[in-house]
Amino acid sequence: ALPISPFLVTSADTYLDFDLGRLPKKLPSGMLGLLVMTNNPPHHPDGDYSPDENSILRLDGDKLTYTGTGMLHPDLVRDVPDSVFMLRKVFDEAVNAGKFLAIEHDGVWCDVGTESRLSQLRKMLDQSA
């Protein structure tokens, strides 16, 4: 069952030092999501979405990378007929409709989806300890 209010999502294969307190208590009226975006890493140089001057995400322009963390309104997925689906497709539709906002993160972020990137993150964290 879906919650009645926006909820936090975060990918299990990412690491970031983002302060979740920066997220709003609720989404602005009509918005279906807010994604935490960061500079593009070497393995994803083209990014995902481009924030405009009002932080509304667009499919064109200078793109940033989605960190895997954000807030989603349950209406975003409420009517998706499939029990298993790609969030990217749902995100693209909402972005195309101007219903997603961005908040930029310039701190540490790492996609640890490969052994190599996980190893690099572990080395970085060990050095900073």
Predicted regions, residues:
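Short, Asp-centered acidic motifs that coordinate Mg2+ and/or phosphate
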Residues: P6, L32-G33
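Short catalytic-loop micro-motif centered on adjacent basic/acidic residues
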Residues: V9-S11, L35
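Short beta-strand-to-loop element that shapes/binds the nucleotide-sugar donor at the catalytic cleft/hinge
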Residues: L34-D48
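Catalytic-core segments of class I nucleotidyltransferases/pyrophosphorylases
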Residues: F7-L8, Y15, L20-P28, N40-H43, ...
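Hydrophobic/aromatic residues located in beta-strands of well-ordered beta-sheets
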Residues: G33-L34, F100
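Short acidic-glycine loop/turn motifs at beta-strand connectors
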Residues: S50-S55
